[in-house]
Swiss-Prot record:
This is Large ribosomal subunit protein bL20. Belongs to the bacterial ribosomal protein bL20 family. It comes from Prochlorococcus marinus (strain AS9601). Keywords: Ribonucleoprotein, Ribosomal protein, RNA-binding, rRNA-binding. Pfam families: Ribosomal_L20. The lineage of its organism: Bacteria, Bacillati, Cyanobacteriota, Cyanophyceae, Synechococcales.
Amino acid sequence: MARVKRGNIARKRRNKILNLAKGFRGGNKNLFRTANQRVMKALCNAYRDRRRRKRDFRRLWISRINASARINGTNYSKLINGMKNADIIINRKMLAQLAITDPKCFEKIVSSVSQ
């Protein structure tokens, strides 16, 4: 049976991990075993945080909408309920952007909902 030499394959596998570990601090970037652990942890965190980002941005938008709504004399829940009843379909991202960039337009939305 022929001898199987795996030097190239093993080096490619290690280099792939070490390339992913670029920018890490200390031995985490150039010692394979610790780099491998750090890369696996980083990939787990990235997977988790891709899902968490959606929640975090929604929370941010809601906070911004609530702050602007309170300036205009109402609160978030009344504003959203009024918009739903008035068939105004603007998502929270757009509403938060309006509240920051165009307060007069946001004020008109609040006044139309309050009626």
